[in-house]
């Protein structure tokens, strides 16, 4: 009885301490550290549309009227980005900010600032945006995408469907996934594959490891029955592209000046 009396209270305190430590998962800790560096990107671009493209117009009448010109129309889109430098540099996807008239960046604290596209690279689907210096900007810590392995934890942060500060968890499902096998023959990329949920609006947001380091930039998803596969651009490549965009506004890619033909 004396033995239990002496150890009992100490054991209870130890258990309470353990439960306190375990009250939040590593995902919560990582998300709280990285979320201030994740931004929402809203864009506007002007497109030309058929003046009589309305579904209310009878198809026969539309054919009789013919081509009577086009009308300008405002198109709006949304994506994600990650602050990679506290001076206001935001890394995102090229398809998020290409040919835009206006870029608005919403920070985690709700403040919205205008952004300027420094440059885009269609081959790697990466872009660099500069926002004006704003007090308290927090840059994310970049990891080493050569150091990750299949089975490592993968955490996706972003604003899918405009839902800010969304966090999803998965693993690295595969490495060096050729983007050409996914139907994008105009790009040259080996992607990180993950089962962390990535949806429209996640594009340009970071893929994070369990240490809170950015290992990739989320770029596309393959959905459908039995699918739901997400893909991210390795951060080592993204960093190189960002440096070139910052220095030159563009990325120069080497190519072979030759054409393959079939010989009979």
Identify the role of each PLM range.
Residues 14-264:
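Serine-dependent protease modules
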